[in-house]
Regions:
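Anaerobic metallocofactor- and corrinoid-dependent redox/one-carbon enzyme cores
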Residues: 1-172
Length: 172
């Protein structure tokens, strides 16, 4: 059998309800951001994430380690929520990794290019942001993934996304 972990991409409160009902939850998913105001906009706080982590650990489904959290992030989330307090989006993203690191995640996945041209205008900016996120993930010591994507109204195309994917593979 292949070792597999299941995860439902839903709000953390829904996952807590599933755990309370006895569902077999392996990983708890939640989008996180780098400011308290942005996380509040997501309907979460640190105590809620801690409660979810403890609930998932109580199920004792893992056979190795205590990594039961899966977080998604992305440059621009604090800006789009007007919750950046004048701080640049890369710094806000690095702060999101600090939030995630506290909960010993299995994966922190940046979804670079998802928000659109308001925050990352073109393919060059998507590539830059993806490499910044990868670098900050390494510096922060979080298990980092990168979902390279773009919205159709951006000045980007599939070649930009493939270039970023190759650069990330080379960066390790």
């Amino acid at each position: 059998a292949i070792p597999t972990q299941s995860c439902i991409l839903t709000h953390v409160t829904n996952t807590l309800q599933l755990i309370e009902r006895g569902a077999p939850v392996d990983l708890v998913f939640q989008s996180v951001a780098g400011t308290e105001a942005a996380n509040s906009g997501f309907g979460i706080n640190l105590a809620m994430l801690q409660e979810a982590r403890e609930a998932a650990l109580s199920l004792r489904r893992g056979t190795l380690g205590n990594n039961v959290m899966y977080f998604e992030t992305g440059q621009g989330s604090c800006l789009s929520a007007n919750a950046h307090h004048g701080v640049d989006q890369q710094t806000c993203e690095a702060r999101a990794y600090a939030v995630a690191r506290h909960f010993e995640p299995l994966l922190v996945n940046t979804v670079v290019g998802f928000i659109g041209p308001e925050y990352l205008y073109d393919g060059k900016q998507i590539i830059r942001a993806g490499l910044e996120d990868h670098f900050m993930g390494k510096l922060s010591g979080v298990p980092m993934g990168c979902d390279c994507c773009y919205t159709n109204h951006m000045m980007a195309d599939q070649n930009d996304i493939e270039n970023l994917s190759l650069l990330l593979a080379g960066a390790g």
